[in-house]
């Protein structure tokens, strides 16, 4: 069995990979997916630097609504405070450094589960039992460190990078592309978390191309997915995209009769948006669903999976039954995607793994590789 050049690091291999024009492009090399060293670079240069999607803003609608996450090893909470402001802050107690909140929910205050130090929703320490005998203790000196948080198109985005450009500035091209869909007005109706046994980029790339649909999804949507109906233009620096036209009989994927924003063929267009590094959105005129991905080691990915409906369908008497059918379909599609992407990761770990040439329908994958190289190997 012929082995590849082991003197190159995965970072070097990625740089060589994207040096080829798209017309000669190959898939990314295996080490980019399987290497601990490459993952460390990603956490430092991608997930600590770029904006990460947490959830939809309407999922945190009331004061005290919160959700938690670990971003590049940093425990973070996103919470709506008493003034109605969404804020992200450290999820680590300032006493003995226990994490504070778990999962998602609603709380009147933030209480440490270890010694009951209690914080207001804005992160200021409200009280700490049995601290009066410590002469240097001052309650007013304690406040949870804040993390940058912005709302964009209804999404809650956070970053550990104080110098990252605003989300709206980076993604102005997305607004130009789908502004008439009114994505900021769509309502989230479900949210789940999952962990799959594959690399996060394998799942991201699986979303970015629809080339796999007829085969991987033969049991669900494959028969409705015509390769000739898929359009994959070159991507932008902060995102890539492609689109598919849906048949008119797929009611929820088409514009509602009361939708006056969308005209012509746009009333049946489905956009697949990949917002770097790891927000993946399927946006139709009637509903949306998304994945927000974070690595859990090289061989596992943590998935924040949600979706919902456009405002016209939210108010339609038949909408809930339509969406329940779509959610059942999405669950079945995810079973197929999980099987395919976990097989890919097992193959990537093989000594025989070699990157093959890309189809013209995998243009988004090439653009994603270029984005990663720009972050990992900056000029």
Residue ranges and their predicted role:
Residues 6-7, 18, 173, 177:
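Peripheral, non-catalytic segments flanking oxidoreductase cores
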Residues 47-51, 98, 212:
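Generic structural signal for secondary-structure transition and capping sites
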């Amino acid at each position: 069995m012929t082995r590849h050049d082991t003197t190159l690091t995965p970072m070097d291999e990625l740089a060589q990979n994207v040096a080829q024009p798209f017309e000669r492009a190959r898939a990314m090399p295996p080490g980019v997916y399987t290497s601990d060293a490459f993952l460390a670079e990603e956490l430092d240069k991608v997930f600590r630097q770029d904006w990460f999607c947490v959830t939809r803003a309407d999922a945190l609608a009331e004061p005290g609504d919160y959700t938690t996450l670990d971003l590049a090893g940093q425990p973070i909470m996103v919470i709506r405070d008493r003034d109605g402001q969404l804020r992200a802050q450290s999820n680590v107690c300032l006493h003995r450094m226990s994490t504070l909140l778990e999962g998602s929910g609603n709380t009147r205050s933030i209480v440490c589960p270890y010694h009951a130090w209690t914080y207001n929703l804005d992160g200021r320490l409200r009280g700490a039992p049995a601290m009066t005998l410590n002469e240097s203790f001052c309650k007013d000196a304690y406040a949870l460190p804040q993390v940058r948080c912005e709302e964009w198109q209804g999404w809650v985005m956070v970053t550990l990078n104080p110098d990252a450009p605003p989300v709206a500035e980076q993604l102005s091209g997305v607004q130009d592309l789908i502004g008439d869909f009114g994505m900021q007005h769509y309502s989230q109706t479900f949210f789940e978390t999952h962990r799959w046994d594959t690399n996060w980029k394998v799942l991201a790339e699986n979303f970015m191309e629809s080339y796999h649909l007829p085969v991987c999804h033969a049991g669900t949507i494959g028969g409705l997915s015509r390769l000739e109906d898929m359009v994959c233009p070159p991507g932008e620096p902060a995102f890539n995209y492609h689109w598919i036209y849906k048949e008119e009989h797929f009611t929820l994927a088409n514009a509602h009769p009361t939708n006056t924003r969308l005209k012509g063929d746009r009333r049946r267009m489905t956009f697949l948006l990949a917002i770097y590094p790891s927000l993946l959105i399927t946006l139709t005129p009637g509903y949306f669903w998304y994945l927000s991905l974070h690595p859990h080691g090289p061989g596992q990915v943590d998935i924040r999976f949600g979706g919902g409906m456009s405002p016209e369908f939210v108010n339609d008497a038949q909408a809930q039954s339509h969406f329940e059918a779509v959610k059942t379909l999405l669950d079945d599609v995810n079973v197929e995607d999980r099987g395919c992407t976990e097989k890919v990761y097992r193959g990537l770990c093989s000594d025989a793994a070699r990157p093959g040439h890309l189809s013209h329908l995998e243009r988004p994958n090439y653009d994603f590789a270029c984005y990663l190289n720009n972050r990992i190997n900056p000029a």
